[in-house]
Design a protein with these regions (language model features):
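Outer-membrane beta-barrel translocator domains and adjoining extracellular loop/strand segments
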Residues: 32-38, 77-83, 172-179, 223-229
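Membrane-embedded beta-strand positions in outer-membrane beta-barrel channels/transporters
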Residues: 49-51, 141-145, 193-197, 236
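Transmembrane beta-strands of outer-membrane beta-barrel pores
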Residues: 24-32, 70-74, 150, 164-172, ...
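Outer-envelope beta-barrel architecture signal
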Residues: 14-20, 60-64, 136-140, 154-160, ...
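Outer-membrane beta-barrel strand-turn architecture
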Residues: 14, 56-60, 150-152, 170, ...
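Membrane-embedded beta-strand positions of outer-membrane beta-barrel proteins
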Residues: 20-24, 66, 144, 160-162, ...
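Outer-membrane beta-barrel "beta-signal"
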Residues: 231-243
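Conserved catalytic residues of ABC-type ATPase nucleotide-binding domains
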Residues: 1-106
Length: 243
């Protein structure tokens, strides 16, 4: 009888196995390893995310889900040294720094050459300027998650979610002092990662729920050969309907 009761308690209404949600939120890409770009520390950068997802409940405790999400990974680097193409003497083919791997810009724009701190010290060139470098990589992501219900009473519920995702790069921008200077040539077209989140949900009307969801994302390979903020905090708000 006890086993039968547990099985009955674990069953879910067949009319509510599926749920579709829309959501939007804010995110912050963080530098957790004190990584540097061109000798300068990568700073955190805030962005927005939004998407749609569907979930299938196996029973009252477990569910699986997937969907599509637009998300942006970014970083800011202050006091980056660079030389403008207007300084024609520096871009002369005879200049040894122009071909230096250390001095190669991570931007596709040939009007600017971003240089490391060590190269700047070696050059001691009056044409060297400093500015703020912002890099933004936007992806369309497809997650695959498993959810476990840790609390479900009356109209409120709390779920823990974990899984992985694959993302396709759809936007790649590098800005210097607020002006677009091209793309990061080291960005990978596809990115992979893991995600962990908690969904706090409240039923507002029959099968309609609102939710808030703090989350953590980790990106494995945003760039080929450069450091980049790989850890991201997120906070999503959304609405879902079960059927």
């Amino acid at each position: 009888k006890k086993e039968e009761k547990e099985k009955k308690d674990n069953l879910i209404d067949t009319k509510e196995r599926w749920a579709v949600a829309v959501f939007a939120g804010v995110a912050s890409s963080e530098n957790t390893k004190n990584e540097k770009t061109l000798g300068n520390v990568n700073d955190s950068k805030q962005s927005n995310s939004y998407g749609v997802r569907t979930k299938y409940s196996i029973n009252k405790k477990w569910a699986v889900g997937s969907g599509l999400k637009i998300n942006e990974l970014g970083q800011s680097v202050a006091n980056v040294s660079y030389v403008s193409a207007k300084s024609n003497a520096f871009f002369n083919s005879g200049n040894s720094y122009a071909d230096s791997p250390v001095a190669v810009a991570n931007s596709s724009n040939q009007e600017y050459l971003l240089i490391s701190n060590s190269t700047k010290e070696a050059m001691k060139n009056e044409n060297v300027q400093t500015g703020k470098l912002d890099q933004n990589l936007r992806y369309i992501e497809m997650p695959l998650e498993v959810s476990y219900s840790v609390f479900n009473k009356n109209k409120a519920s709390i779920n823990l979610n974990t899984g992985g995702f694959v993302g396709k790069l759809i936007s790649n921008n590098v800005n210097l002092d607020g002006h677009t200077i091209g793309e990061n040539t080291n960005a990978n077209d596809y990115v992979y990662g893991s995600t962990l989140s908690s969904t706090v949900q409240y039923r507002v009307y029959k099968k309609t729920n609102v939710f808030i969801e703090p989350a953590m994302n980790y990106y494995i390979n945003p760039l080929n050969s450069q450091s980049f903020n790989q850890f991201q905090w997120g906070l999503n708000f959304g609405l879902n309907v079960s059927f």
